[in-house]
Amino acid sequence: MKSSVRIASLDDAETITILINSAFRIAEGFFIEEDRINLEGVQNYFTTGRFLVTAIDDIPAACVYIEPRGERAYLGLLSVEPARQHNGLGKLLMDAAEEFCRELGCRFMDLNVVNLREELFGFYGRRGYVETGTSPFPADVVTKLPCHFIDMSKLLTT
């Protein structure tokens, strides 16, 4: 089983949409009723940032969105195909995203975690991310439970 990380192209948008929705359906189905994102939404992300894709034997199995913003970068939509979760793909992709942004001159990586996804605080905390505040959950997303984001950040050391 050979894995590789690459920068996604707009041609990958449909595959990325399916990957994100399958991962988030499992993880967030208890509080979100709809798909996490549609094809147009993924395509719009390509105008402001990039997706990295991890492929196993040339088949996309995980993706993450990164958006460099000067000395800071934003990371979001970390998604691993449900059947491949808990096998280190998320860590591999996080390492690649952090290195990519570091090479662009970013000093910090920022991300948001839904407060209801408590298991993610440990995952990101072990990777050096610390809580920096809160922000509102998008008002246009229908949720079954009230929720908000916990903002987290990490210094990208050299």
Mark where each language-model region is.
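Conserved GNAT-fold acetyl-CoA-binding loop/helix
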Residues: 17-47
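A short helix-loop-beta-strand connector motif used in the catalytic cores of GNAT acetyltransferases and
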Residues: 43-53, 62, 74
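Conserved beta-strand in the GNAT
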Residues: 59-67, 74-79
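A short beta-loop-alpha structural element at the N-terminal edge
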Residues: 4-16
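Glycine-rich acyl-CoA binding loop
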Residues: 75-76, 86-97
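A short, internal acetyl-CoA/4′-phosphopantetheine-binding micro-motif in the GNAT/acyltransferase core
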Residues: 78-85, 113-114
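C-terminal "cap" of GNAT-fold acetyltransferases
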Residues: 43, 51, 107-110, 114-121, ...
